[in-house]
Amino acid sequence: HAQPLCTPTRIQLMTGKYNFRNYIGFGLMDPNEKTFGHIMTDNGYKTLISGKWQLYSYNPLDEMPEDRNKGQKIEDAGFDEFCVWHAHQTEEKGSRYKNPIIYQNGEYLTKEITEGNYGEDIFSEYILDFMDRNSDDPFFVYFPMTLTHRPLEPTPDSEEFAIFDPPS
């Protein structure tokens, strides 16, 4: 299940369906779709998604407003826990890298937590913590990385990271 774009690939992976069977619009997952999060949770696994969501409401206000808020909410995707970027509206997504806007288990992380930090590090640390907390139980982790495409921004290992001001 792979497509030339990240969103159709992620929906295929999570639903097990080809895109002609699950497509309702770009950046949207049908709110009635059952994901592997549901299946794993129903079968006794502790489940986590940590990384990119971007499947609830992709369109900006001035671009196809009729498709806003039609996708699946992260809270309804079948996972016990989540730590995701772009959980809701496009205009609220901010940077996915430096100073990211991250929605974790029903609350946005505060700037005190995210300021100066790198999104992938926050996601990875949450995954490691989840695995430690659930090491005695069967668990399932889905890590849809945000690093797969543009915008290309400095990483914590680059000299430019300290002075880089990401879009908000």
Predicted regions and their residues:
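Formylglycine-dependent sulfatase
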Residues: 1-168
